[in-house]
Structures are given as C-alpha cells and as structure tokens.
C-alpha cells in the first residue's frame, strides 16, 4: 500500500504541472495564430479538461484516443 501511495502522490502531485505546461504551449500557439491570450488560455484549458473527461469516461487507453 505504501508503494501505491507513493505512486499516486507522484502522479497527482506532478501531473498538474505537466498539464499547465501543455495548456501554456497550446495557448501560445493560439496567440501566435491571432487569438487574444485570455481566449487562447480558456480554449486550451477546456481542451485539456475535455480530453481528460473523455479518457476517464470512454474506458479506452489514452493511446487509442490519441490515434483516433
């Protein structure tokens, strides 16, 4: 159980930081394409949220979703 708790802590503790890096990169691309930064951030964050929801609710492996 202790080992599982360490893995859970690593994923849940570090995971959001990686999500924020991806959101920032997507938003930067949106700004370079001409979107206002606030809108680009909102779109990128909603994309990340929707993707996470799809991954949880579909039951498919993330690689399957990526390849669709």
Task: Label the predicted regions.
Residues 4-68:
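Helical "substrate-binding/catalytic lid" subdomain
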